[in-house]
Amino acid sequence: MREFGSASWRDIVRWRANALEIVLYMDAPPSGPSYLGLLARHIALLTAITEEWRELETSRMPPSAEWVATQLAVLLGKELHTAFPDYRTLLARAVENPTDSAVQAKVYALVLELLKAAKAHNAQRPALLLAADHLASHLGSQDERSPEWDARRRALRIDGLTWHWSQLGASWFYAHDLLWRIWKEYPASPWGERAFVRLLDLGWDTSVGCQKGSDQFREVIRQGEAFLARRPMSPARAEVKFLVAQSYETWWSLSQASREDQYADPARYQDGATTARQKAIAVYKDVLGLVPTGPPSTYARRVLPRLGLGFPTNQRRFFCVYD
């Protein structure tokens, strides 16, 4: 990897031991006197940071942050392909064009169809309800008093779906009522487990305005570890472990927050922070064993060098701020 500003370096000597590299060089810049320079760097750490910057330049969100939702969309699309072949296509359009009125109308119509089908099909009911929930999360309005949206909300409220106005976000947000219902009524089913994973992914809090408090990571850890203890071989264990690892990483990072941080007081998170870092490392390694490729493993490989060195990672995945 070429060092920034190294065009004028001369007499370069390098020493390398495992991941650590030390570079001694003479710099003769075009203007100013020559000087002896010393550079030390951790190769794995530098590579991870560089890859992260490149990724953030090309995506609105890291793929790892959307992994659970993406996986769920794929699974639901396969399960319901025969009866609802356009489900995944419409879901993708809703993600890309969240305020398009034509897309919103189609999303609303399909949510109603899914809810109707769920009432008639006992065997597929959990999957149909989960599909309706996942699609309904892309249904809303930026107009607080829209008559059309008000009529849609009233119709969907009959099936237990509710939306709440976010003053800060200036939009209506779905409360994921169906997720809670599925997890309560079908906890032993594969789709009940998928609802559980999605609730973890949402910080175990589907309210507007962090109503359950800012420290979502604590409940994600509690719920996730209890799930893994009861169901160590669950098909969803990789997702649960990844979310638990991110929760421990969040705890560690909050304990290392700057004193000037407007939202996180590092003093509040010191108790247990070292253990949280160690557990984050251990669980991320478990994730690498379960999912060797893809967004979670890519993320784990990038963050492990920093955690291993005891550096803050600025992870705030499960720290809720409403401001």
Language-model regions, residue ranges each:
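Acidic, polar-rich low-complexity tracts and alpha-helical solenoid repeat scaffolds
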Residues: 1-323
